[in-house]
Amino acid sequence: LSRKDKERIFEQKMSPLYISVHTTVPVLRQELLENPKARPILEEIAEMTEHHIVLHTQIVLCPGLNDGHYLTKSIQELADCYPGVESLAIVPVGLTRHRANLPEVKTVDAHYARELIALVYTWQERFKKTLGEPFVFAADEWYVIGDVVFPPLEAYGALQQLENGVGMLPLFLETFEKTDFSEPLCAEEPTRFILVTGTSFSSFLTDCLKKVRCDNIEFQVLTIINHFFGDSITVAGLVTGKDIINAVLENRTHRYSRSVTRGETKGLDVLLIPEVMLAETKKDFLDGTTPQEIEAALEMPVHIVPADAMGFIETLKILAESPRDRLLDHFVMDEHSLDEGSLMDNGLGMVTGPRALWRAER
């Protein structure tokens, strides 16, 4: 952040802020960011907290680089900054296919994920005694990779780290579980909602939709393989527009069509895209494709829907009645999202986070 940015934060008391730390070890952090001039992060944090700016922090964990004793040091030093630093999210690195001539970074596997979850749990128990709060949290993706059951929602405290993918999935699942679907969703004409998502969330979304009672409506969950960044990138927030177009076109011949015929009645296909797939401007995808271009290419109505469960459910109810109508743009960018951003291809070919906040540190 520039001096001008900081002065604006202090003057407007823009708190809390979300910042990417990755490690508190100065030399290692400079290497990770490929920025030999990067100021020690603990100095940056001290300056912020001295001005009464509360911080939520994130570590993108890269096996073999900033884990082990480096991670232990980072967790403890960030906890020492509590309550100025209110929480810490640990997120697994995602490796893009754009990694020619870059340092080797190991892929996160199930065994590694389970070990990380166990480590975080140990730290949480310690911090509950010393700070009265869990403080450190493992992102949902660790549980997906490790095939580990999510902890109860109350284990996530005030859910301060939703933006970093901590508690998003458990919250989505619990909201669906508690929603009353006794009244079925009804459509005047047979309607097929095609819902696109990344591979991480696909099975969860499919299970959730089984709870929804429908009349004249069916759901199809279409898993989008990320060809743009590489198939190891599984989160919905990094899916691109062209990958959506190609996936729908490839599957249309045997599953989808513009007008689905059921007996003598023609139906309608409608594509639903979670807003988390749009870039920070909310106008296009990370590859520059716009929702309008997707609609033109596929010749079907396209709707951008909320990523949170309650907003998604309410939008489904509206679309069930009028699937051809255009929804109002409901996206409002939070001015407090002036964070250093989720790490995007910082020279290590690393991306992370459920959302597309693409402000890489340099």
Cite the ranges covered by each PLM segment.
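Auxiliary Fe-S-binding modules of radical SAM enzymes
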Residues: D80-C81, A89, G94-R362
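Conserved Radical SAM active-site core
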Residues: L1-G84, L95-W123
